[in-house]
């Protein structure tokens, strides 16, 4: 079930040491992935903004994507983007990058903010990404939702406030 939520607009992700393996360098940032069997975190660091704390190099965290394994797909638990980097559509780019580079299937989070619904709406507009929905996690009823003004619109069933699950895979 995907429900609508509201979050505060200001986010400061701060400085931290780079964690995980470097999986790519895009848009002037380093993208690192830390993965276990059931969880994965993807961090985006600004290469140009850093400071030294106790003789260790700490870079500014630009974006964070937290994923957990559920029903054969990677469930989006949390995506955050630092307020200083607003307007660059980093979350959209990060979703596409993760889908293409890691070759995984993403499953929409069970609670989505306005920004989260917008990200999935823009993913559906991309020709290199296939977005589909199931009436339930184990359902055989599959729908290919259309893009709406700000959120996806299902053809066969309501995507929000029901038990529907939304997925994205690189085409």
Q: PLM features: residue spans?
A:
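Non-catalytic substrate-recognition and accessory regions of acyl/acetyltransferase enzymes
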Residues: 1-86, 93-171
